[in-house]
Design a protein with these regions (language model features):
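Active-site loop of short-chain dehydrogenase/reductase
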Residues: 5-6, 55-56, 82-84, 130-144, ...
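Conserved glycine-rich cofactor-binding loop
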Residues: 14-15
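Conserved mid-core segment of classical short-chain dehydrogenase/reductases
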Residues: 71, 92-109, 128, 152-156, ...
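Catalytic loop of short-chain dehydrogenase/reductase
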Residues: 92-94, 139-163, 168-177, 189-190
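Catalytic Tyr-X3-Lys loop
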Residues: 101-121, 139, 164, 208, ...
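Amphipathic alpha-helical dimer-interface segment in Rossmann-like NAD(P)H-dependent oxidoreductases
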Residues: 114-133, 172-173, 177, 227
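A glycine/serine/threonine-rich, flexible loop-to-helix segment
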Residues: 153-155, 173, 177, 184-211, ...
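C-terminal substrate-recognition "lid" of short-chain dehydrogenase/reductases
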Residues: 215-242, 247
């Protein structure tokens, strides 16, 4: 009988950090599920590149703020591949993406529905099958903005990221009996073309002045923390901070 390949589900993996983490886990031998909500072409492109490099990847659409959709996603993965072994809650709402017609309340609900509710729903479904998948991993992707918010517009984003730390500790305690570890990855600013395009070169350089190392991190530098969390068997309920000193620089 062919040995079952372990499955890693990365939410919000159609671009940026999520796509990078998908590539890294595929490189470790996981069958990677590239989750996305809207960008079909981008997600399919990420999965295709992983397959071209010899990895195993499949793009799957699911709005993780939709409970029935999340239940259906995990049930499908259980039926097709024997379940999920590694869950990476990476999906978020970009704090700079607020539409002009969104009221404060609408924006709050929008950000938390994906960044917090979505992570909770995915953790909850992972837990439903936990007894059958011992030695699993959950990694919740937070941000240094959880402890160092920078502007009024980011209140909802920072709040959602801080709440993930509590979610991590709660599930770490609940799932330890199944040898499942749950940790938080908290990156600082990441240098991506999309980010620099949005804030401009001047804005990017100004942000870098508030990082002790004087630069933003790369997606691969952040993904190093994910690899560690996935490979380590004895760390749970903890936070891996990778921010170049952004949390304490002036």
């Amino acid at each position: 009988m062919e040995e079952r390949k372990r499955v890693a589900l990365i939410t919000g993996a159609s671009q940026g950090l999520g796509a990078c983490m998908a590539r890294r886990l595929a490189g470790l031998g996981f069958r990677v599920i590239v989750n996305y909500a809207h960008s079909t072409a981008r997600a399919e492109g990420v999965a295709a590149k992983i397959r071209e490099s010899g990895g195993d990847a499949l793009a799957m659409r699911c709005d993780i703020s939709d409970e029935p959709a999340v239940i259906a996603l995990f049930a499908e993965l259980e039926a097709r591949f024997g379940g999920v072994d590694v869950l990476v809650n990476n999906a978020r709402i970009d704090p700079l993406s607020r539409r002009p017609d969104e009221t404060d309340g609408m924006w709050w609900d929008h950000v938390l529905s994906v960044g917090l509710r979505g992570a909770y729903l995915c953790c909850n479904e992972f837990t439903r099958y936990a007894e059958h998948h011992r030695n699993g991993r959950i990694v919740n992707v937070s941000s240094c903005r959880a402890h160092r918010p920078n502007e009024l517009e980011s209140i909802a984003y920072s709040t959602s990221k801080l709440a993930l730390h509590c979610l991590t500790r709660s599930y770490a305690a609940a799932l330890a009996k199944y040898d499942i570890t749950v940790n938080t990855l908290a990156p600082g600013m990441i240098a991506t073309e999309n980010m620099i395009r949005r804030i401009g070169q001047t804005g990017y350089e100004e942000e870098c002045r508030h990082i002790a190392l004087g630069r933003a991190g790369s997606c691969d530098e952040i993904a190093d923390g994910l690899v560690w969390a996935v490979q380590n068997n004895f760390m749970t309920g903890e936070t891996i901070n990778i921010n170049g000193g952004q949390t304490y620089a002036p």
